[in-house]
Amino acid sequence: MKNIGIINCGMGNLHSVSNAISNIGFNPVIINASKDLVSFACSALVLPGVGSFDLAIDRLEKKNLIEPVKLWIQEDRPFVGICLGLQLLFEGSDEGSKPGLKIFNGYVSQFKHSLVKKVPHMGWNKLYFNRFNTIDNLVPHYFHYDLQPWAYFVHSYYIEPKDCYTFNTTSLTFYGKQKIVSSISYNNILATQFHPEKSGLFGLFILKRFLSSY
């Protein structure tokens, strides 16, 4: 059984992600330090989180996990970012002053009250897929342009990429008048603004198909 490392930032959804990983047939292991990546011989990494951008970066720094996580991604090893874990892949956030992991160009912005009903964006919302993206290479037969599944969201900030050509925008979501990039892919990265671990069978399917590909 493959070990799937779940990075512990102490930011919310560790338990539910661990249960989801177990339910789809993998062995979840909690990563608290860089040495855990080696000792657990992880096949993939998951970076979950809900809450403060700066606090998450601060905790990764204190656990000396910033560079190991960046190296893992740079080596094209399987990586899943969930909610805050997606946002941390970018340069920084309106929420604070700390730099992100800078895997992608762009920043994380707060919802504008003039465009949305209320903040945070919490609950179920529909995903829209682009028929010309390459998500079928990652989770074939389901993530497809003519299917519009629903997923569960909890967030007050959203990513604003500078250069969408550096990765594949695999799905969009609309909240009020605001368009949200709700999932992206790049090489061996799958990152979602929604919570697959809380999105029922659809969310579990996404995780299983991606993690089973490696």
From Swiss-Prot:
Keywords: Amino-acid biosynthesis, Chloroplast, Glutamine amidotransferase, Histidine biosynthesis, Hydrolase, Lyase, Plastid. It catalyses: 5-[(5-phospho-1-deoxy-D-ribulos-1-ylimino)methylamino]-1-(5-phospho-beta-D-ribosyl)imidazole-4-carboxamide + L-glutamine = D-erythro-1-(imidazol-4-yl)glycerol 3-phosphate + 5-amino-1-(5-phospho-beta-D-ribosyl)imidazole-4-carboxamide + L-glutamate + H(+); L-glutamine + H2O = L-glutamate + NH4(+). Pfam families: GATase (PF00117). One of its GO terms (cellular component) is chloroplast. It is found in: Plastid, Chloroplast. GO terms for biological process: L-histidine biosynthetic process. Its EC number is 4.3.2.10, 3.5.1.2. One of its GO terms (molecular function) is glutaminase activity. The keyword Disulfide bond does not apply. The keyword Plastid applies. Residues 3-214 form the Glutamine amidotransferase type-1 domain. Pathway: Amino-acid biosynthesis; L-histidine biosynthesis; L-histidine from 5-phospho-alpha-D-ribose 1-diphosphate: step 5/9. HAMAP family: HisH. Heterodimer of hisH and hisF. IGPS catalyzes the conversion of PRFAR and glutamine to IGP, AICAR and glutamate. The HisH subunit catalyzes the hydrolysis of glutamine to glutamate and ammonia as part of the synthesis of IGP and AICAR. The resulting ammonia molecule is channeled to the active site of HisF. PANTHER family: IMIDAZOLE GLYCEROL PHOSPHATE SYNTHASE SUBUNIT HISH (PTHR42701:SF1). This is Imidazole glycerol phosphate synthase subunit hisH. It comes from Cyanidium caldarium (Red alga).
